[in-house]
Amino acid sequence: MAIHADTHDDLRLFQTGEHACGYWSDRRARDLVLDPHDPRLGAIYPQALAWGFRRSGDLVYRPHCERCRACVPVRIAVDAFHPDRSQRRCLTRNQDLVVRVVAAERTDEQLALYRQYLKYRHPGGGMDEHGATEFDQFLIGGWSHGRFLEIREPAIAHLPGRLLAVAVTDVTEHALSAVYTFYAPEAAARSLGTFAILQQIQWAQRERRAHVYLGYWIEGHAKMNYKRRFSALEAYDGRHWCDLPAHPSGT
């Protein structure tokens, strides 16, 4: 299978075999994957985001399940975004934190936080055994133009504050893509996942980028409900991006 990549050639697509669904335990999933060996992959990636694809490591994929279309690509049109009351409270609650964008280069501190998060969120699932190699393969990859958005406690005596969260973010000419966010489990009350997205939106606004891609939203899935709380949300129907009105409860 191939898709039109430019005026000269096509980019090959591969379909994976069926595998366990990462969202519904009673379903099977499969994906479309852009040719990972194509040297143009980095150049075509911005367009692939607009086609509903997503990056994991060096793979750019999109769900393509035989009997399920639950995974809906979503993005935020940042110029039209306005935080709701809950999101404003989140910003206020975390105004003491220090946010900075750094190179996508693993540090021991980031790796320790990543492993702590996986043990909390995915105990016994295999991911909780990830080390430095898996960190680099999953989050950084070999060709992506990524950055790490770090969220820290305030500095103490000119030393950096404790690292609370990292939002792995891909940067393209016109958009940011939220790849993965991990945070200190004991700081869950701060809603750092939501706070990270709000910071990515502000980052995109500062740099005049049009969208922040949030990956996939699944209607009725508890872990995906938070995405519906964001205004200016758009969903991809396979051909076009359409407005998806925010829902205060996220359902």
Swiss-Prot record:
Location(s) in or outside the cell: Cytoplasm
Keywords of this entry: Acyltransferase, Cytoplasm, Transferase
SUPFAM superfamilies on file: Acyl-CoA N-acyltransferases (Nat)
EC number(s) from the headed UniProt entry: 2.3.2.29
Top EC category: transferase
One term under GO cellular component: cytoplasm
Pfam families assigned: ATE_C (PF04377), ATE_N (PF04376)
An example Gene Ontology molecular-function term: leucyl-tRNA--protein transferase activity
GO biological process: ubiquitin-dependent protein catabolic process via the N-end rule pathway
Catalytic activity: N-terminal L-glutamyl-[protein] + L-leucyl-tRNA(Leu) = N-terminal L-leucyl-L-glutamyl-[protein] + tRNA(Leu) + H(+); N-terminal L-aspartyl-[protein] + L-leucyl-tRNA(Leu) = N-terminal L-leucyl-L-aspartyl-[protein] + tRNA(Leu) + H(+)
UniProt cross-references to InterPro entries, sorted A to Z: Acyl_CoA_acyltransferase, Asp_Glu_LeuTrfase, N-end_Aminoacyl_Trfase, N-end_Aminoacyl_Trfase_C, N-end_Aminoacyl_Trfase_N
Function in brief: Functions in the N-end rule pathway of protein degradation where it conjugates Leu from its aminoacyl-tRNA to the N-termini of proteins containing an N-terminal aspartate or glutamate.
Family the UniProt entry places it in: Belongs to the R-transferase family. Bpt subfamily.
Descriptive protein name: Aspartate/glutamate leucyltransferase
